[in-house]
Amino acid sequence: MKKIIIGLGNPGKEFQNTYHNIGFLALESFLKNNKHQMIPNSYQGHLYQIQLNNCISFLVKPQMYMNSSGKVVKKILDAYQIKIEDILVILDDIYLPEGKIKLRPQGGHAGHNGLRNIIECCNTNKFKRLKIGVGYDSNIPLNQYLLTPFNLHQKKQILQNIDKIHEIMSKFIQGISFNNLMNQYNVIK
């Protein structure tokens, strides 16, 4: 059974080290540590194939802006005939403290425009999410906070659980029950 992991972010160097690109950062970090193959495609996304313990899956970095990510996701789901319940979306969450992680089996968009667009394009909210906390300083306008490059200390803070994030991604690809993953990783402080 093939799975897809989608890291949300915005294309372009100016967004590279911003809170809103945490999904891209998590995917890139995972790819550095695992053998993979880039798949040429016409879906407006970077598509990578990975095999872990005989489980073949795809990792996706949509190359449209965050608010249009759903178009890329829908095209890839249709092309590879992958069910919505077999995707995991990695995204930033302003409601979680920096670096904290939370798995959700489904839900609304909570104001996150990338999630909103995936829900609209796929016509469902029944897909799994790995939320990575980026906190939020309410003294700064939200767009500015999410799209301003962070410093090295902030990056370390955000990625403090990167090993756990990699474990979750690996176990998801290998078909470990999502309920088991939530029970194991949602308790991490």
Curated annotation (Swiss-Prot):
Site description Discriminates between blocked and unblocked aminoacyl-tRNA, residues in chain: 10
Active site: 20 (proton acceptor)
Cited InterPro entries: Pept_tRNA_hydro, Pept_tRNA_hydro_CS, Pept_tRNA_hydro_sf
Localization per record: Cytoplasm
Signal peptide (from-to): none
Record's keyword annotation contains Transport: no
SUPFAM superfamilies the record matches: Peptidyl-tRNA hydrolase-like
Annotated keywords: Cytoplasm, Hydrolase, RNA-binding, tRNA-binding
Subunit record text: Monomer.
Catalytically driven reaction(s): an N-acyl-L-alpha-aminoacyl-tRNA + H2O = an N-acyl-L-amino acid + a tRNA + H(+)
Enzyme class, broadest EC rank: hydrolase
Entry binding sites for tRNA: 15, 65, 67, 113
GO molecular function: peptidyl-tRNA hydrolase activity; tRNA binding
Organism: Phytoplasma australiense
Protein family: Belongs to the PTH family.
EC number: 3.1.1.29
Protein origin, superkingdom: Bacteria
Residues carrying the site annotation Stabilizes the basic form of H active site to accept a proton: 92
GO BP annotations listed: protein quality control for misfolded or incompletely synthesized proteins; rescue of stalled ribosome
UniProt xrefs under HAMAP family: Pept_tRNA_hydro_bact (MF_00083)
Function as written in the Swiss-Prot or TrEMBL entry: Hydrolyzes ribosome-free peptidyl-tRNAs (with 1 or more amino acids incorporated), which drop off the ribosome during protein synthesis, or as a result of ribosome stalling. Catalyzes the release of premature peptidyl moieties from peptidyl-tRNA molecules trapped in stalled 50S ribosomal subunits, and thus maintains levels of free tRNAs and 50S ribosomes.
Identification of the protein by name: Peptidyl-tRNA hydrolase
CC terms in the record's Gene Ontology section: cytoplasm
